[in-house]
Amino acid sequence: MTKSEKIIELTNHYGAHNYLPLPIVISEAEGVWVKDPEGNKYMDMLSAYSAVNQGHRHPKIIQALKDQADKVTLVSRAFHSDNLGEWYEKICKLAGKDKALPMNTGAEAVETALKAARRWAYDVKGIEPNKAEIIAFNGNFHGRTMAPVSLSSEAEYQRGYGPLLDGFRKVDFGDVDALKAAINKNTAAVLVEPIQGEAGINIPPEGYLKAIRELCDEHNVLFIADEIQAGLGRSGKLFARDWDNVKPDVYILGKALGGGVFPISVVLADKEVLDVFTPGSHGSTFGGNPLACAASIAALDVIVDEDLPGRSLELGDYFKEQLKQIDHPSIKEVRGRGLFIGVELNESARPYCEALKEEGLLCKETHDTVIRFAPPLIITKEELDLALEKIRHVFQ
């Protein structure tokens, strides 16, 4: 039995089986490359679901984390830490918002945004108590906690978890008329992924985000953009909302915000929204901790200084066009923006992901029939060409 096999056996024995990973153990990583305990080398085309946009172990981010670890790691929010204010300023200026509220995981940030929207609905908009509604979209993925599960349209995400939470409506993604019909006097917010990731890299129709913005303005409803997976350069723009040139009332960010080395997420909005929180009304012991802020400051610097959105746009266009040229009866569609690309098949994508692993390329199926390609944004054209060579070989 190999070391990898022993690790997988141990993991399966003691761990809950809430994931079905490919049978590979990653023990080392740098840039776009990872290794297993046996020394086999693989190219990472998933980026930990876009949490590693800056590449594995980016030296600037790692150094920032090490330097901070030598000073102070956690103070809780009972006291001030010396880099939280700096991080607040950087992320607020980047997003063009007045205020930020840090959490740890994407799901926590979604929960925070939903709480903010409900309290805003009662305290600012004047909706009758306990009547506020939030509209989401079929195919959405906003996390695994109870509120995101309650607004999901996937039966398996909800099975056995009832009773689900009330106050959510769902409409079809891309259908302006359905959204218009769903909005009423009790609508507090519309929660949308500018690109639906887990649903299979679903791109909205042109002008759809603008239509959402206009409807929200017309009815005094908050436009909440979940940019956890598609944001911070992944789509070829700093934020995926930039494709429609709209400005949401609320941003939710996570994943690459921590540079792949420390979890941090955030809700960003103007004072009118985030000032609904008062001391004691919401919090997180680890939210905005010194280690997370240090890693995030460096992670954001890397995104801007190395122009990762621009790299993603240029290389993503090239990669997508090359994928479209692969002639195979199983390939139904190639779609995406930047280095956020889905190859939809007429059959299950899992066997193809397993075959690509054997070729030294790591990716993961989503929505059963879609292969998601989302490499670190630092990838080179030469590395993409190597990936394309392996992909063509599998489809031959």
UniProtKB/Swiss-Prot annotation:
Listed cofactors: pyridoxal 5'-phosphate
One GO BP annotation of this record: L-proline biosynthetic process
Subcellular localization, as worded in the UniProt entry: Cytoplasm
EC number(s) recorded for this UniProt protein: 2.6.1.13
Superkingdom, taxonomy of origin: Bacteria
Catalysed reactions listed for this entry: a 2-oxocarboxylate + L-ornithine = L-glutamate 5-semialdehyde + an L-alpha-amino acid
NCBIfam families xref list: Orn_aminotrans (TIGR01885), PRK01278.1 (NF002325), PRK04073.1 (NF003145)
Classification via SUPFAM superfamilies: PLP-dependent transferases (SSF53383)
Family under the similarity heading: Belongs to the class-III pyridoxal-phosphate-dependent aminotransferase family. OAT subfamily.
Organism from which the protein derives: Staphylococcus aureus (strain MRSA252)
Keyword Cytoplasm: yes
Single GO molecular function: pyridoxal phosphate binding
Pathway: Amino-acid biosynthesis; L-proline biosynthesis; L-glutamate 5-semialdehyde from L-ornithine: step 1/1
Function recorded in the entry: Catalyzes the interconversion of ornithine to glutamate semialdehyde.
InterPro entries in alphabetical order: Aminotrans_3 (IPR005814), Aminotrans_3_PPA_site (IPR049704), Class-III_PLP-dep_AT (IPR050103), Orn_aminotrans (IPR010164), Ornith_aminotrans_bact (IPR034757), PyrdxlP-dep_Trfase (IPR015424), PyrdxlP-dep_Trfase_major (IPR015421), PyrdxlP-dep_Trfase_small (IPR015422)
Record keywords, A-Z: Amino-acid biosynthesis, Aminotransferase, Cytoplasm, Proline biosynthesis, Pyridoxal phosphate, Transferase
Bridged cysteine pairs (disulfide): none
A Pfam family per the record: Aminotran_3
UniProt entry tagged with the keyword tRNA processing: no
Name by which UniProt lists this protein: Ornithine aminotransferase 2
